[in-house]
Amino acid sequence: VRWTLPSGGHATVRLVTAAPMLRFSFREYLQVDVESSVRHEFLDGMILAMAGGTPDHAALAMAVGASLDRQLAGKKCRVYSADLRVRVLTTGFAGYPDVSVVCNKLEVDTEDANTATNPAVVVEILSPSTEQYDRGVKLQQYQQIVSLCHVVLVAHDEPRIEVWSRSGEEWSVAIASRGEHATLDALG
């Protein structure tokens, strides 16, 4: 559709019909996720396919997980890979952090025994295709998890780690660059 504006210019708008958005239950999401060769996240009733990772992404996630595992040796915390699904009980969001840490007993979702609900730490390796989503929607979702103390965002293109830490109801961020250490105070 093309309009003539009062200024004499023109505006063109392309009209697109939109199909009604389908909303799924968590159980329906689980069925899709289990039966698919691609992992999915669950957000506001929508099932979102996740982008596949690169070898560098996988190696960085493994290095972060191994480092956490060494540092937590002897503590009542366990480090998990991206195979562990995490669910935010207050919003229903479910996803696969690149690395998760659960301290004390693993608590699982009432609808799925393979979904954790009580991580103390989640780590996301940022990538060009997911960085905006990870820093925005996903970070906000993770921050709703009552047990969560830290969200760690690891840059893919530079030596930079952001550690988001909870203090009461507030969250603050500390940034570690080349030669600096990222600290997860809540884990001791």
Describe each model-derived feature in a short phrase:
Residues 1-188:
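Gly/Pro/Ser/Thr-rich low-complexity, intrinsically disordered segments predominantly at protein N-termini
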